[in-house]
Amino acid sequence: MQLKGFHHLTAITADAPKNHHFYTQVLGLRLVKKTVNQDDVQAYHLFYADGRGNPGTDITFFDWPVGPEKRGTNSICRTGLRIKGEKAFEWWAAHLKKNGVKYKNPVQRLGRLTMDFEDFEGQRLSLVNDESATDFAIWEKSVVPVEYQIHGLGPITLSVPDLAATDAVLTKVMGMTLLKNDDSIHAYKMNAEGPVSELHVRVEPLLPPAQQGAGSVHHVAFNIPFADYPAWTNRLKDLRVPNSGPVDRFWFKSLYFREPNGILFEIATDAPGFAADESMDKLGETLSLPPFLEARRAQIEAGLKKL
């Protein structure tokens, strides 16, 4: 019973149309699910991913009318996006520049070439070299050539003021192992290969606590086999980890809990998947609602802005 890497990462935007343009027309991802926040149906929940919406490739956004994030610790502070090969960095540098996106020159970070940049709201992103990347589905309609397309998430970086309590949760509750560290980053590994399995932790005791807003990350979700869901439910209960209890999101089943610094974690199943209610070739083209919200479709659609 082990984590298979990341499932998705959910962040916050205050401008859904501009967000949609950036992640599809600049980063070249596919909008695989256009739905709403199930706890706040006036807000879009947009899922961008590879060509099939595979777990581990989704970066998702809640659309909330909020001010910008106040950066600090106790937060998820950077999201890695995997690409393959050094030549891809040359293409992406030119592509980002053409689209007016500022970026930093690539550097080696824990042995991988990494290029940092931000979206229009200050969402901190990095392109990360993953030479072994094969676990993604191409998106034929992407603005990005196949050989340079983003393969998925990883690594994802947390900022905490003290490592000890977070380390205990990552290793004793979630079964991660400390892979390596340098002066500023501690890298933890899940049961998969490459950056999709790595959670990085920065220890930054001098920073103030972050305040969420546009440009911040709301939570990170970890991938498990569907069959392991009952066991993970029992594990959190047995270890007395305060959690949400089972939550059915229709496209996957979830468990939510917070690590000791308040950072929200989710455990999410790899099935049923986004094709549960839409054909693969039509993913994300219309508003998709879980069955319990379908009776309110007209009301919900009337309250949403056009993308």
Label for each model-derived stretch:
Residues 147-243:
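Surface-exposed interaction/gating patches
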Residues 5-14, 32-35, 65-161, 186-200, 239-307, ...:
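Vicinal oxygen chelate
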